[in-house]
């Protein structure tokens, strides 16, 4: 998975949208992959990152206004976008989407 993330973020500006459980997990994998140009975290609530790993923090009610300032946005599943996903210029991805990029041929869906 790290190889897919590394390729996706290489030399790009990256935003983590939502800093709950999945956002923190994305932050760990992005740091592990490295190679990004800049990183930021956007969340409705005030957040902090651990020392030694600086990231620009965008917090408050307008936290979604910045999406098109970034090349790649890692969106947490609980975040409802303010606009249709196709109205953004940035590439918006999720952990689930990256999982299917990597393991899609090995997955079988079972319903009801």
Where are these regions (language model features)?
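Short, basic phosphate-binding NTP loop
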Residues: 1-111
């Amino acid at each position: 998975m790290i190889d897919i993330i590394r390729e996706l973020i290489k030399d790009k500006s990256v935003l983590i949208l939502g800093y709950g459980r999945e956002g923190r997990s994305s932050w760990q994998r992005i740091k592990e992959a490295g190679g990004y140009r800049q990183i930021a975290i956007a969340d409705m609530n005030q957040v902090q990152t651990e020392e030694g790993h600086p990231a620009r923090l965008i917090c408050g009610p307008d936290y979604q206004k910045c999406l098109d300032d970034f090349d790649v946005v890692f969106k947490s599943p609980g975040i409802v976008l303010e606009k249709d996903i196709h109205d953004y210029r940035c590439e918006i991805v999720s952990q689930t989407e990256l999982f299917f990029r990597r393991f899609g041929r090995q997955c079988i869906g079972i319903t009801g």
